[in-house]
Amino acid sequence: MKLITNKQGLVGAITVPGDKSMSHRSIMFGAIAEGKTVIRHFLRADDCLGTIKAFKALGVKIEETEEEIIVHGTGFDGLKQADGPLDIGNSGTTIRLMMGILAGRDFDTVILGDESIAKRPMNRVMLPLQQMGAKMHGKDGSEFAPITINGKQSLKRMEYHMPVASAQVKSAIIFAALQAEGETIIHEKEKTRDHTEHMIRQFGGEIEMDGLTIRVKGGQTFTGQEMTVPGDVSSAAFFIVAGLITPGSEIELTHVGLNPTRTGIFDVVEQMGGSLVVKDSSRSTGKLAGTVVVKTSDLKGTEIGGDIIPRLIDEIPVIALLATQAEGTTIIKDAAELKVKETNRIDAVATELNKMGADITPTEDGLIIRGKTPLHAANVTSYGDHRIGMMLQIAALLVEEGDVELERPEAVSVSYPTFFEDIRSLLK
């Protein structure tokens, strides 16, 4: 696919699609709640539609209208054995959280996905769930999908110190803990996104959060809710960077989710001297959201590492692009988690942006980016990773001559089906 290039400035306003993490979880909580849950501004992208498909296979009635998703909850005990394996496609969130949800059910389940999912590590979820009494294993006894979950297990409480900062692992344990006897205590290594914890409260449950420690009791029941999913800050990040680095730009992004566990990119933009303003912030059905305005800025290099990394882990590919247009060196560290995403994002970012003229050195846990460098035409690939594909389209906006050809552009539909249309809508 030929990407959009050499456009002088992006100007206008858009509303980015609903938050991917929250869209997944809204279906999950709607399913395990009693009664009806109505979800607006749901992300109708491949990953989240896969979560709907999985719960339909488990016997949950889910209606889809133009404006809403309506989930008729069954409670945990109303979930039924699927007729065959659950195919969750490309979604790491779905497979890992479903492992927690299904660990305590009274039937067996096999969960599988695409070739990317088959390469992603699942021991980080399986091992703590097995400590709670779950029985599950990967293909041929490995840690890789397909994952077989043997039901009819009685889950017990545990106290767990997380070895990695992962919201997916934490959420899988929480879902299992809701079905276990007693109170489970989780100690996070670093603070990660807390949508699962907030949704427990939104759906009428109880959970204690004190710094990095979480306490959750088993045997809880939930009640269906009405909710509006705010815009995904991870999707907004591509337009934030586009607005900062494309000459003559000013972009307004409306109804963007502002959960503090997700807004690390705002802090980085401020460190680098970028113009980013948040206005009209409000709580929509309990969720903090607002309008983000960015404009073309002169940027300087910075160092990114430590406890900010979980707050911007998904934005690092496009932050790396931002750094190529900043004066000086930017160092990103403590981000080894990028190696086990849809692809090895450390290598993918360095390889593809270097093809376009960037000066990036990959490291064991991050990237060293030397700026400022002009970018030129090249043939690039997304590696089947939505965030790499979208980052490369933003990079292409800076190319003045020649074409940028992207292999595997279809990956973008995993999280942002209208991405290329929204880019075109902002062209001067």
Swiss-Prot record:
Designated gene of the protein: aroA
NCBIfam families: aroA
Source organism of the structure: Listeria monocytogenes serotype 4b (strain CLIP80459)
Keywords recorded for this protein, A-Z: Amino-acid biosynthesis, Aromatic amino acid biosynthesis, Cytoplasm, Transferase
Enzyme class: transferase
Compartment(s) where it occurs, according to its Swiss-Prot or TrEMBL record: Cytoplasm
Gene Ontology biological process terms, A to Z: amino acid biosynthetic process; aromatic amino acid family biosynthetic process; chorismate biosynthetic process
GO molecular function: 3-phosphoshikimate 1-carboxyvinyltransferase activity
Major localisation: cytoplasm
Top-level taxon of the source organism: Bacteria
Residues holding 3-phosphoshikimate: 20-21, 25, 166, 168, 314, 341
Enzyme Commission code: 2.5.1.19
Catalytic activity: 3-phosphoshikimate + phosphoenolpyruvate = 5-O-(1-carboxyvinyl)-3-phosphoshikimate + phosphate
Entry-linked Pfam families: EPSP_synthase
Species classification: Bacteria, Bacillati, Bacillota, Bacilli, Bacillales
Residues binding phosphoenolpyruvate, per UniProt: 20, 92, 120, 168, 345, 387
PANTHER family given in the database record: AROM/DEHYDROQUINATE SYNTHASE, PENTAFUNCTIONAL AROM POLYPEPTIDE
Name this protein carries in UniProt: 3-phosphoshikimate 1-carboxyvinyltransferase
Active-site residue numbers: 314 (proton acceptor)
SUBUNIT field: Monomer.
Family indicated by similarity: Belongs to the EPSP synthase family.
Biological or metabolic pathway of the protein: Metabolic intermediate biosynthesis; chorismate biosynthesis; chorismate from D-erythrose 4-phosphate and phosphoenolpyruvate: step 6/7
Keyword Transferase: yes
